[in-house]
Structures are given as structure tokens and as C-alpha cells.
Amino acid sequence: MYNYLDFEKPVADLEGKILELKKLSESGEAVDVAEEISRLERRSKDALRDVYRALTPWQKAQVARHPDRPHCMDYVRALFTDFTPLAGDRAYGEDEAVVAGFARFKGQSIAIVGQEKGNDTHSRLKHNFGMARPEGYRKAVRIMDLADRFGIPVVSLVDTAGAYPGIGAEERGQAEAIARSTSKCLSLKVPNISVIIGEGGSGGAIAIATANLVYMLEHSIYSVISPEGAASILWHDSTRAKDAATNMKITAQDLLQLKVIDGIIPEPVGGAHRASDVVIRTTGETIENGFRELAEKVGDFREQRREKFLAIGRSL
């Protein structure tokens, strides 16, 4: 059974009936329900398509946060081989909210930096729900330094509600760590590609998402603050998150129109969590094509990246 979101109730009702009929059929009772199951499955597919065809920005935010959505390590395990993670920032400690290391992708060496949320209570606590501390961003800088030194392209997989706002993180220089990571992304001499696979929250996301090419999954979000946070600031009422999401231009479609991102990776009907293997494969193909495009069209990766982000600033 899926974890249904509140706006998926029509689909949940139909799929619940299908499950009941399948159990009845498997029980051995002399009842032919195959035709009814087939009819309900068609209705369910149509209902799911109708729901996802008309998602609001707030509903997309809910899909982006879905607990069953594939996370960073799901992509790493499926797309890359010989992944060797590196740990620690060589200054304070290790932050498991950030996954970083080297691997092989389509026969080539690649550096990977990503944010991992975890998929159950234990792993979510271990990875701090994907909210990185300063050590995580300094680890990312360490990996990008090595990649730059050895001429290895960088892939970043972004999925965070934002950098961790705890007192300890602030005491250890959270803002400086984010700024340094962003600066490192901008100064890389090698090509880098970033994919927003779920949430792209504030500076916590942009610290590893400042890339030559930035892609978003179809139902991911990317914003300077969460809808709840914006609603709390603007109206002193976090329950108005729906209104905030509508006005913030947080969806992939809005950001492509604003030229903040370079492309949208399609998701299966119902979201990435309904067919993880499909969306992961499509993401891999997009990354491969992106690096090929950069190799063919860009001579100076650092200059192209600089001009890209300056152009965003001029146009907004």
C-alpha cells in the first residue's frame, strides 16, 4: 500500500477497493471479480492522471516531501558503480546529512555530493533529515577541491528542507560554510551538474546546487524558504502555507520559465515514489546527456557558470 497524500483520496478509495477484490479472488471463493478489478484499475489510472495533471504548488510541495520518494542514496546505488564515500571535514567531525565521495559513471570517474534524508526513523535521525551542519558543507568543499585537482566532473543531488538551524551549527559557522561551498561550486574548473530530486530549500540547497546545469524533477520544489516559513513571516500564520506556495514560484515549471533551472526531468504519473526505477533511470540519462552537452558546447566551465548566474540576477 502507498502512503497517500490528502489530495489523493479519490485514488486511495479506488485502489483500496481493488485490493479488497484481489484478496477476495485469492481467498478461493467462487466469485469472478476479474472484470470488476480491470474496470476499477482503469478508473484508478484515470483518477491518478487527473489529480497529477492539475497539481497546485502546495500539492507539489507535498509530493516533493513524500516519505517514499527515492532519496540520494537510492540514486547513488542505482546509477553509479564503485562508490567510495569520504567522511569528515578534517576540522570538526562527520555530518551524515551530506553524502560525498567518488564513483564511476558510464565508465568515467565522477565526484558525488548529495543530501540524504533517510527512509525510516533510524536513518532519518542518522542523516538529520537531510539538514546539513557546517561539517557537511565543508566535507562537500573537500570533495569538490579533490575533484577540481584531478579533473573529475561533479554531480550534486539536492534534497533538503534547508541547512540545520541549531545553535551548535551557528556557533561552528553555518553561514560561512554555506557561502564557502557556494563559492567553491562557482569556481570549479570542471563541469558540474545539479539535480533537485525532492526539496531544494534555501541556502542549504544552493550551497551544492550552483552548477553549469541545474535540473529539477517534475514534482520537486526549489525556494528561498519553505512555504510554512514564508507564511509565518508574511502573515504570522503557518497554516497559510498553501497561499505562500502559490505566490513563491517554487515549482520546476515556474523556475524553468524564470530561467533559474535548465530543464525538467519527467516523473511517472503519481510521482517518483510510484516508479522509482523509472525516474532514477531517466535522471541518469539526463546527467549523461548534460555532461555530453557541456563537453561539446562549453569551453570554459567556470566562465559559463559565472555568466549563467549573473544572468539570473539581471533578469529577476
From Swiss-Prot:
Pathway annotation from the record: Lipid metabolism; malonyl-CoA biosynthesis; malonyl-CoA from acetyl-CoA: step 1/1
Its Enzyme Commission number?
A: 2.1.3.15
Location relative to the cell: Cytoplasm
Q: Which GO terms describe its cellular component?
A: acetyl-CoA carboxylase complex
Which domain of life does this protein belong to?
Bacteria
Q: Which reaction does it catalyse?
A: N(6)-carboxybiotinyl-L-lysyl-[protein] + acetyl-CoA = N(6)-biotinyl-L-lysyl-[protein] + malonyl-CoA
Mind listing the GO molecular function terms for this protein? acetyl-CoA carboxylase activity; ATP binding; carboxyl- or carbamoyltransferase activity
Q: Please report the stretch or stretches of sequence annotated as the CoA carboxyltransferase C-terminal domain.
A: 40-293
- Class in the EC hierarchy, top level: transferase
**Keyword terms:** ATP-binding, Cytoplasm, Fatty acid biosynthesis, Fatty acid metabolism, Lipid biosynthesis, Lipid metabolism, Nucleotide-binding, Transferase
What biological-process GO terms show up in the record?
fatty acid biosynthetic process; malonyl-CoA biosynthetic process
Task: Identify the main location.
Answer: cytoplasm
**Would you identify the family this protein belongs to, as annotated?**
Belongs to the AccA family.
So what does this one do?
Component of the acetyl coenzyme A carboxylase (ACC) complex. First, biotin carboxylase catalyzes the carboxylation of biotin on its carrier protein (BCCP) and then the CO(2) group is transferred by the carboxyltransferase to acetyl-CoA to form malonyl-CoA.
Oligomer status and interactors? Acetyl-CoA carboxylase is a heterohexamer composed of biotin carboxyl carrier protein (AccB), biotin carboxylase (AccC) and two subunits each of ACCase subunit alpha (AccA) and ACCase subunit beta (AccD).
Listed name of the protein: Acetyl-coenzyme A carboxylase carboxyl transferase subunit alpha
Origin organism is Chelativorans sp. (strain BNC1)
Q: What broad taxonomic lineage does this protein's source fall under?
A: Bacteria, Pseudomonadati, Pseudomonadota, Alphaproteobacteria, Hyphomicrobiales
